[in-house]
Amino acid sequence: MKMMNGEDANDQMIKESFFITHGNPILTVEDTHPLRPFFETWREKIFSKKPKAILIISGHWETVKPTVNAVHINDTIHDFDDYPAAMYQFKYPAPGEPELARKVEEILKKSGFETAETDQKRGLDHGAWVPLMLMYPEADIPVCQLSVQPHLDGTYHYNLGRALAPLKNDGVLIIGSGSATHPLDETPHYFDGVAPWAAAFDSWLRKALINGRFEEVNIYESKAPNWKLAHPFPEHFYPLHVVLGAAGEKWKAELIHSSWDHGTLCHGSYKFTSA
């Protein structure tokens, strides 16, 4: 089947969706950060296809209603404090895609998310632009960002993702950007390897995803060990639930990166490929 632009629909279609841990924004200036080579070799080792657009769900945009930004050029939001001055000079001027934003809003409303709306001003927070700046440094792919609703649960976000899954048929790459674990800042660092509580949670999550047990991940509060330490607040976990829904039916999960910061912050990242 040919698209109106002459492109074959099967060539445009994307079967993959991704959950990435975006890490500490210091990685923008810290060459030795373990996430840098992962992001910098993204197109070479992880996903070589150039998407028509990117829809990224960041744990740093929390709203009451599901909201997608609808701008022509994305501003770069420096939503962090007390970092080196050079970090506040970074710009990632990726184009927006208002048409995609309106389509996301329409799809969500038709799927039961009646309060979905667009935001005509918001740019990209560091959960979006920091990894994208390294993954797609040319900033030539249109990007829309979708918010999370931390007062709701994992199943809600999974269903949100299910509604958005057809966007992949149009060449939209769906990325959830959060963290495999995201403990409180005051959680003690663990300098002798990985904290046992964090290792147990990571092991549970990895096995659940690799074995396709998404239902357990949706109700992680009753299934996961040490979840209150791993995710005392859920905003960095919910991008994963959205991506699980967007993965569609009969998906296969693959761990594409794993490293740690301070023995407690897990950089686990996953690819989900639909059948």
Curated annotation (Swiss-Prot):
Keywords: Dioxygenase, Metal-binding, Oxidoreductase, Zinc. Opens the cyclic ring of dihydroxy-phenylalanine (DOPA) between carbons 4 and 5, thus producing an unstable seco-DOPA that rearranges nonenzymatically to betalamic acid. It is an enzyme of class 1 (oxidoreductase). Coiled coil: none annotated. Gene3D superfamilies: LigB-like. Binds 1 zinc ion per subunit. It catalyses: L-dopa + O2 = 4-(L-alanin-3-yl)-2-hydroxy-cis,cis-muconate 6-semialdehyde + H(+). It comes from the Eukaryota. The keyword ATP-binding does not apply. Its EC number is 1.13.11.29. Pfam families: LigB. This is 4,5-DOPA dioxygenase extradiol 1. Belongs to the DODA-type extradiol aromatic ring-opening dioxygenase family. It comes from Beta vulgaris. Zn(2+) binds at H22, H60, H182, H236. GO terms for molecular function: ferrous iron binding; stizolobate synthase activity; zinc ion binding.
